[in-house]
A protein has these predicted regions:
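Non-catalytic terminal extensions of PLP-dependent enzymes
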Residues: 42-219
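Mobile "lid/hinge" segments at catalytic clefts and subdomain interfaces of large enzymes
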Residues: 1-63, 67
Length: 219
């Protein structure tokens, strides 16, 4: 539901001066309710409690692993997070030129879909590991994030180029890696296989970096 002041009511979608409904499902999606109902019925009271505990435990595990390098934006009085955590990425822009978008794109080279970007805090990454992730998978993700942190430090320390680097050029699709032209000061190995475990089950993205704003407006 959306609440507005009385003087704005006539401008709501499909009213006197409003625009057409912008949602493809203006009355909602009943399928979402069926999924939620099935999830609750299959888990039961004990299962729901246990899965919630595991989700919170997983999020706090990642926060403990990454807090000293990235920093955690919000924590409770005990220093813990809920079922998700927000990684601080805003300082990197000043020290290396790297943005939260660069980190999200680089994660694709490690085989991970980008986490929630710049929400609810601009310039951050919000990560929600959920209850189903194994310790091994959490450790792999932690390793990826720490390696990306090291890549940022390489830029800060002058080891990597300020603009032509693995972060700002990420992601690296297969056609780029196997192509004849390679105009980067870093190796194809570092671009495509930044960690040993990546090569074991490499997930290739289809395209290189795109203009996010243009894509949101036109695709």
């Amino acid at each position: 539901p959306i609440c507005v002041a009385k003087h704005l009511a006539e401008f709501l979608p499909d009213l006197n001066f409003g625009i057409n409904t912008v949602s493809s499902a203006p009355y909602g999606s009943a399928g979402v309710l069926a999924i939620t109902y099935g999830y609750i019925r299959m888990l039961g009271e004990e299962g729901l409690t246990h899965s919630t505990k595991m989700a919170i435990l997983n999020a706090n595990y990642l926060a403990a692993c990454l807090g000293d390098t990235y920093g955690i934006v919000y924590t409770g009085e005990t220093g813990r997070v809920g079922h998700e955590l927000i990684l601080e990425c805003r300082n990197f822009k000043n020290t290396s030129g790297v943005s939260e978008t660069d980190i999200a794109k680089r994660l694709m080279d490690y085989g991970y879909h980008a986490p929630t970007l710049s929400f609810p805090v601009h310039g951050t990454l919000m990560i929600e590991p959920t209850e189903s992730e194994s310790l091994a998978e959490l450790d792999k993700f932690t390793d990826a994030m720490l390696k990306i942190y090291d890549e940022i430090k390489e830029i800060e320390n002058g080891i990597a180029d300020k603009t032509n680097n693995v972060l700002m050029n990420a992601p690296h699709p297969e056609y780029e890696i196997v192509g004849d032209d390679w105009n980067h000061p870093y190796s194809r190995q570092k671009a495509a296989y930044p960690a040993p475990w990546v090569a074991e089950n490499k997930f290739w993205i289809n395209v290189a970096r795109v203009d996010n704003a243009y894509g949101d407006r036109n695709l």
